[in-house]
Curated annotation (Swiss-Prot):
Top-level taxon of origin: Bacteria
Biological source species: Vibrio vulnificus (strain CMCP6)
Protein name stated in the entry: Chromosomal replication initiator protein DnaA
Taxonomic path: Bacteria, Pseudomonadati, Pseudomonadota, Gammaproteobacteria, Vibrionales
CDD domains linked to this entry: AAA, Bac_DnaA_C
Recorded name of the encoding gene: dnaA
Region Domain I, interacts with DnaA modulators, residue ranges: 1-84
Length: 468
């Protein structure tokens, strides 16, 4: 076997792989054939691990095709091919000369690289170049409701047409409302539609960690090429970029490169883009270039539907009245609902008792007691007054100025949503008002949440504060 073996393999790989993929991962490799062992040298651990993970089978297939049973052993190393000791020049045929003169630079002798790689850091090997998309989170097991309807519709559109009109897609809302589920659902749908698509999901802190490792190990160019070569980049909790200036700088350029290439970006945050503190204005501006959608806390009907769906997944019968009992008392987010249901199911399995309202009340007694203690009308009034920088006495007064009337209506709507008090009881707690006044306030706030971004934001922020 001659030194042209790897050249032949490279030529075939160049035919089989997309041009950018070949240039990024295969072209940088150097080769050395010695004692029936073919050693491939990668410039850093990141490239080495990627090649071994993605192309090992293809390389072995080509070696077997060219060598038959005399296939060489294959090794990978980080560094450059060492300079061979001088040997007497052998007699070469014109064909040998032509083959060697046409060999790429990767097969020519270079000075050895003496860089040592820290075993703990493992260079850039820890960069997670797998998709990380959770196959369990799909559109068909996402429970749709009024609170997430627009977000779900936007996510479906993006999955059907990645890199299209909604780029970037920015989903925001409190913890446990389904933003991460939607990210994974989009990723799964894109891959289902196009199996070769390169879709990467990650938490924003992972991006920061990868960048730091790339900087530490002189692999920033590989880092850039990797992140800018994806078909869809899905980043959770973008607010964790706050005050990380170098990460923001790198993400800014990555963001621009992906948008210019019509590659899809989806971001999530716990707040509206312009309200993320510690993030540069130029980034916050770009976050809003596509479509920004709020994911709201689920309303009662959606909470019930979520519980019924999860019970069905566990092959557990959950009576409607039991689902309503739980949903009326746990209002903050989907994660809390699922946790409560898991607890109820576990208790039922341990005791062998049927799941009734009395059983649920017993199984969740500490959680329900905590909720009732935290969310009272008094607590709502104090929280709303503090939020709008007015006095609780203003909420109870007869004043009708908008600066007081609107917070009062919000507080009434929150009392109806977050407590089990009747409309007359809520009216009494707000200065002896009639129950029709409370009903009007609830309907008005529901209407304004559809029409006014500010009211929608205020309502979500107050729900999150009162339910946490």
């Amino acid at each position: 076997m001659s030194s042209s073996l790897w050249l032949q393999c490279m030529q075939r790989l160049q035919e089989e792989l997309p041009a950018t993929e070949f240039s990024m991962w295969v072209r940088p490799l150097q080769a050395e054939l010695n004692d029936n062992t073919l050693t491939l040298f990668a410039p850093n651990r990141f490239v080495l691990d990627w090649v071994r993970d993605k192309y090992l089978n293809s390389i072995n297939r080509l070696l077997q095709e060219y060598c038959g049973h005399d296939i060489p052993n294959l090794r990978f190393e980080v560094g450059s091919r060492p300079v061979a000791a001088p040997k007497p020049a052998p007699t070469r045929t014109p064909a040998d000369v032509a083959a060697e003169s046409s060999a790429p630079a990767q097969l020519q002798a270079r000075k050895p690289v003496h860089k040592t790689w820290d075993d703990d850091a493992q260079a850039i090997a820890d960069i997670n170049h797998r998709s990380n998309v959770n196959p369990k989170h799909k559109f068909n097991n996402f429970v749709e409701g009024k609170s997430n309807q627009l977000g779900l519709a936007a996510a479906r559109q993006v999955a059907d047409n990645p890199g299209g009109a909604y780029n970037p897609l920015f989903l925001y809302g409190g913890t446990g409302l389904g933003k991460t589920h939607l990210l994974h659902a989009v990723g799964n749908a894109i891959v289902d539609n196009k199996p070769n698509a390169k879709v990467v999901y990650m938490h924003s802190e992972r991006f920061v960690q990868d960048m730091v490792k790339a900087l530490q190990n002189n692999a920033i160019e590989e880092f850039k090429r990797y992140y800018r070569s994806v078909d869809a980049l899905l980043i959770d909790d973008i607010q964790f970029f706050a005050n990380k200036e170098r990460s923001q700088e790198e993400f800014f350029h990555t963001f621009n490169a992906l948008l210019e290439g019509n590659q899809q970006i989806i971001l999530t945050s716990d707040r509206y883009p312009k309200e993320i503190s510690g993030v540069e204005d130029r980034l916050k501006s770009r976050f809003g270039w596509g479509l920004t959608v709020a994911i709201e806390p689920p309303e009662l009907e959606t909470r019930v539907a979520i519980l019924m769906k999860k019970a069905e997944d566990h092959q557990i019968h959950l009576a409607d009245e039991v689902a309503f009992f739980i949903a009326k008392r746990l209002r903050s987010n989907v994660r809390e609902l699922e946790g409560a249901l898991n607890r109820v199911i576990a208790n039922a399995n341990f005791t062998g008792r049927p799941i009734t309202i009395d059983f649920v009340r017993e199984a969740l007694r500490d959680l329900l007691a905590l909720q009732e203690k935290l969310v009272t009308i008094d607590n709502i009034q104090k929280t709303v007054a503090e939020y709008y920088k007015i006095k609780v006495a203003d909420l109870l007064s007869k004043r009708r100025s908008r600066s007081v009337a609107r917070p009062r209506q919000l507080a009434m709507a929150l009392a109806k949503e977050l407590t089990n008090h009747s409309l007359p009881e809520i009216g009494d707690a707000f200065g002896g008002r009639d129950h029709t006044t409370v009903l009007h306030a609830c309907r008005k706030i529901e209407q304004l949440r559809e029409e006014s971004h500010d009211i929608k934001e205020d309502y979500s922020n107050l729900i999150r504060t009162l339910s946490s």
